[in-house]
């Protein structure tokens, strides 16, 4: 979160010293020396560092940008209407909740709120000295035990000699300490033994509780462990009720050092007036400039691929998606959602494999990108994800290619003085939730993930969330990593337009200062949508009458510089717990009491990656592109379209009803397919079948889905696929990488599947790229006509690829099999199953295109294919393709066909479609071995490569 928010906690530099890390002695002294009045009873006159509006009469800075700067990080292009920077509201003084006017229920609610406010204030005053003492105790368990045992509540609890107190001497020292912590923070109700006072029963229940709490104690060590977690959560709750700004962030962070080399963050005095202004962040825009800059930036990313890693936060459960285990009824992880015929996690890994295939085809090397995955203990998430990956043989990437680490669950805290929610079903159990995806950075440090990636010589990584299947589209990921790695950036955000009223966070450029040295801090950051108003960000349109919001959307698609993120963790307290908040929007008990858990935001580690101006100066907008953080803009549907929740079928179809649902996400996938087909020159109907109602009720206007390895860059795809037409409700699925499509017309369903689209595997079921051993298909001047999908069939669901087909044209290529069709019309329900080592050619007989003749032959004994695509990185970052083919292909086939008609060649009998089963494959005559390949260049249709790469970089288009 932004620096002025109480939710930002800075991490002391002790993180580098040990794992798990603890707060430094200096930071612990600062915390313990704070008076009890700072939190819960602060004087209205107490100055607040990091709060905006403290300069009387100051005018907000205007985000005036220089449109003439055209470097790779050129400032944003603004609308003609001047945009002023948003300034955070002044810090609120403690407010005694007044009794609201109104009816009896409102009066009662106001009274209850006032009581909650007083409970919170009293509890904070009680906990502060205990939290401070815990920080002074450091990491030594004996020292912490001594502090906790001296707490009056704990002493009274032990003296009472209840069932729990009696078994503590027989428990481990750490477990006994954690139980005492529960008592010290006022949660004795959790320890009630309702079923039995039997010591064995009580001990077992306590051990189960402690198994969870020890992870909370370890993860929040820098805040004071379990005590610090409770205190920080209660501070934020109290602030939301009108209490003073939470002080934890300032107390921990005042002495932090900047993650930037050579930049020292000096201590800010308590009276230094500090303001926080938020601007629309500038950045290059992949949507503009004819695609030249997008192509160039993507080529940078392609070159940097051997230095990249992938990071996936997969902690979310699929509750809102309605995903359940059919046997147990338990919620399944969102990663297991069957989206377009495969799980979401498989979709992300297919995108990654496609980028690796492009690198292999371009540079001849098989790069194996390491994948780090953050799971959660919630509802068996970790176990299910681990099991899925193993069942899928690690998706052909090998066990050493993955590193899974588990996010801890944290207690839910209510507004009633911070009381935990006690489970009614399980003895000594509390409601637990994941603590937000911001935990990912500290976990990567504590569990050695950064070390693992460093050993693999990785310098950067792209971060994607599991519920967003769209981020791998075209140039997005390549360009983001390319810009980040080439410019040695610390962090980058892929951003896009945000619709007014959308429930999503925004990206901002924060200008904060001055500090004690007179410097201003700058950096791109994120503001969660739940706190937009708190930061003075209203939902204004970018221009009058526009439906696009002024600030761009945060998409959770990130680039990170691994070393810089590590340094931020080790030198800035904000890195460990970025963007802390407690969301109180929902009730957490049966009687409607609200509460939440302490959460952190993954993106807000950017707040620990700031750049600084010179003392006494502000950094001019023309230099904002030099900051360690950046934004890269693209079209929304090229970056994000999430599948987070199930569509409400009781409501009429609308864009709002489809938002964040699998139905809506798949519609965006088809919009992208429509754009791609336009680029390829393939005519097609409207993607939604006419409108949203038609899409929901009758299905999409067409379906076009392809293995991303066909590209994944659209420039590459457009050289393989050119011309043709998809008729209304046509379905095309190309699960193949090596293919050539020229003027293909489809009415119905066309399914082409290669069982080895990228080559083979080794004995350990690990993918081995080999473009001489993959299946390949050519369709030239081919017409496909059949009845296709039965859209009225029960259970039809386009987004999950749950379809019933009346008829289809299906081609299956096993191993290195080849399928070659030219000038034919394939009608009705036809299936071709080509074995490995075989080649099937289809050509027109005497009766015309519908008179389809088959010719089967063996592939060359030396293993060479009859044709293949050659890739090369050309001018301006264009990946250029050339088709190399052996001489004896279609032309030789035509000659043989003519000879057969004249009775001059003795060959195996020809077969026509429908006359031979796919199970019966005539061997035919072996073709002569190729003496070489004939090269034929591909093209990209309407898109041309830039004349000069430097010119493209200088003309880098910008947004906003």
Predicted region positions:
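N-terminal chloroplast transit peptides
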Residues: 1-64
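Left-handed beta-helix
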Residues: 94-303, 483-903, 909, 932-933
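Intrinsically disordered/low-complexity terminal segments and short unstructured peptides
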Residues: 7, 36-37, 45, 92, ...
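N-terminal plastid-targeting presequences
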Residues: 63, 78-107, 891-960
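Domain-scale recognition of functional cores that engage charged ligands
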Residues: 273-312, 320-605
